[in-house]
Amino acid sequence: MLFRSHNDKLVGTDTRGVTVTADTAVRKQRTLPFHIRLIQGENNLRAVAISTARIEGKSVELRMTFNGPQKQAILHLIAVGINQYQNSALNLNFAQPDAAGILKFFSAASSSLFRTVKITELFNNGATKTELLTKLQSLKGTAPEDVVIVYLAGHGESVGADWYFLPHEVVYPERPEEIRQKGISSQEIKDLVMQIGAKKVLLLMDACKSGFALQAFSARGVDERQALAQLARANGVHIIAASTKDQFASEVQELGHGVFTYTLLEGLQGQADGSPKDGIVTVRELLAFVEARLPELSLKFKTERQYPVAESRGMDFPLAAIK
């Protein structure tokens, strides 16, 4: 299979007559046409063939600089927060307020960085499987220079080696067949993220066992942190999951938020602005801040530390300008 990336983000795969042969075998050349929309500045294009045994062939890279009209990025934000499930026994306290807090921050704080902010909110009974998948599919049309943030807050559950985000209509999470039918699998999320047109993508998951989602993206038996690194490397995205595959995401009444989202907001509001301290919070600064701060804050309000799972691949980019 042939994998193609643009500035470290996977932009497509192809199996059209692609084979990986030993060095001693007779080699055949095949030309495959592709169309890639360049962004302002440096563009790094890479192609590599990978065998069914996941052995990489020799990659080919092409670097070019595009000096076209300067375009300011559009921020596309999808925020999902489910407090109220069809089965009220599943209700949460802070998933919807957490998503609303993320929406409020980016609506007010990032106007200097983005030409406009396009917001999609899916709360409670609006957060159905069909609606969420439709909104994620719409991101395929985003421009390469744009920024995409997808935030998911609600229940998460694992079935076998797969993790599922549970939309509003899930009633019986203890039934594997219902989870498979009504839940949104980690594989579906991965496939849709790969299709996003923007080259700057941040995925935030505030759900129980969300670290398990990242293990499901890779081969069975692979450690979740290795799996997360593979996912980010394959798709060129930055990802933060609230908890490991064995942990529950914490909600704290005193904070008015889940600990994970409270930590995110602390970082975005300026505490993550570190190296360099320039009044701008970048995605990598936010990842580093959450990794250090979340265990500390969760221990303060709970009896044990909550550890996020985070990985960064692709270009760094600004998220917030500190006023």
Outline where the language-model segments fall.
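Short, small-residue-biased leader/transition segments that mark boundaries at the very start
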Residues: 1-2
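Low-complexity, Pro/Ser/Thr- and charge-rich linker/hinge segments at domain boundaries
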Residues: 61-82, 174-176
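Extracellular S/T/G-rich loop segment that most often corresponds to the catalytic His/Ser-adjacent loop
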Residues: 201-262
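Functional beta-strand-loop-alpha-helix junction segments that form "active/interaction loops"
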Residues: 12-13, 17-37, 55-63, 99, ...
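Glycine- and acidic-residue-enriched helix-capping/strand-helix junction motifs
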Residues: 86-104, 252-255
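Caspase-like (clan CD) cysteine peptidase catalytic core
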Residues: 29, 39, 74, 129-153, ...
